[in-house]
Amino acid sequence: MRHYEIVFMVHPDQSEQVAGMIERYTGSITEAGGTIHRLEDWGRRQMAYPINKLHKAHYVLMNVESEQAVIDELETAFRYNDAVLRNMIMRTKAAITEPSVMMKAKEERSAKREDAAPRAEEAAAE
């Protein structure tokens, strides 16, 4: 089996259905004997350039280990799903399991907010 990194962008009006799409795509990979090494839902983000007069999209990143036939099936599913604006499937040399730069930055921001909240409460109490 080979390792792949998959990124796809979903129409912002279909953001509620992203969880179902992820479940469907990961289910097809695991049913065929593949494994999901990393799954990150980056949420709605600004795109670098407009696509179909849209400026935002819902981003999802997956690192998987699977057979080529499953990846071909997944690519066909992306092609015929109107909600998927763009997708990219890249073959990688090894499984990538650590959080991406996007998720690390998100975790750092949330940690800073958690640190700032007790300080604000202490300042208000004084």
UniProtKB/Swiss-Prot annotation:
Q: Which organism is it from?
A: Aliivibrio fischeri (strain ATCC 700601 / ES114) (Vibrio fischeri)
Tell me what this protein is called. Small ribosomal subunit protein bS6
Question: Quick one: a GO cellular component term?
Answer: cytosolic small ribosomal subunit
Q: Report a single Gene Ontology molecular function.
A: structural constituent of ribosome
> What function is annotated for this protein?
Binds together with bS18 to 16S ribosomal RNA.
Give the UniProt family note.
Belongs to the bacterial ribosomal protein bS6 family.
Q: Where is this region: Disordered?
A: 101-126
Q: Which UniProt keywords apply?
A: Ribonucleoprotein, Ribosomal protein, RNA-binding, rRNA-binding
Tell me the organism's taxonomic lineage: Bacteria, Pseudomonadati, Pseudomonadota, Gammaproteobacteria, Vibrionales
Q: Do you know which PANTHER family this protein is assigned to?
A: MITOCHONDRIAL 28S RIBOSOMAL PROTEIN S6, SMALL RIBOSOMAL SUBUNIT PROTEIN BS6M
Example GO BP: translation
* Domain of life from the UniProt record: Bacteria
Which spans does this entry mark as compositional bias, Basic and acidic residues? 104-126
